[in-house]
Amino acid sequence: MTQFPSYASSFRLYKSVSEQYNDRSILDSVKRLVPEKVLQLIADDQNLKPLLHWFKNDFMKWMPKELQCKRCNNRPMSIQLVDANTGALRKTEIHVCNVCGSEQIFQRYDNILRIAETRVGRCSEWSILFGAITNSLPIQTRIVHDYLDHCWNESLINNKWVHIDSTLDYPISFDHPYYYEQNWGKNYEYVLAFSANSVEDVTTRYTQQWYLVQKRRGRKDKMKELREIYYRT
């Protein structure tokens, strides 16, 4: 299992994000980003297809993990990580070309309004901002992390937590919880969902191989320890 210090770092992030999800001024600001025609389409039946399409295809831009040099087209570039953990900035990625030495900088934020301003990121930025937008509708939404390499959202629709992944194409982006295990070969140990006051083990929702998850976990369930870390963070 991943060592607990790495969990603590992500817990700080998701607790901050969950608190922002309860900030009315932030939610009002991100709701104004959504075109009125999209809002009208989802208003009556909580159909998120128009919102997912707009967010992925018209609003956000994906940041690849490996960048190509804009000067000489060399790929891949070397990456230097600079931790910030101050204010809205989490860390800075400095991508340096091994051929010509030019640099590209990608700053990673935990501040919802800053992400909305830059409109670029990977799964964490996408899920953080998309969750804020759905909460503004208001459709209660939270962050989910698999502690492998991906995170997404869950929205409470018809009294059921539904898998939502704004980085994927519809219909896979909506209510396809087994997609990652079936198509990406995910070997889960803990999949956690976050709110401002709690962390929940939702692994069973995303696996059809629970016996293998239990084998990876071993005899001791570590959720009690993880909750204690979350509340202390």
Locate the predicted segments by residue:
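Alpha-helical and coiled-coil interaction segments, frequently adjacent to or embedded
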Residues: 1-118, 122-125, 145, 158-233
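Short, well-structured beta-strand/strand-turn elements
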Residues: 135-149
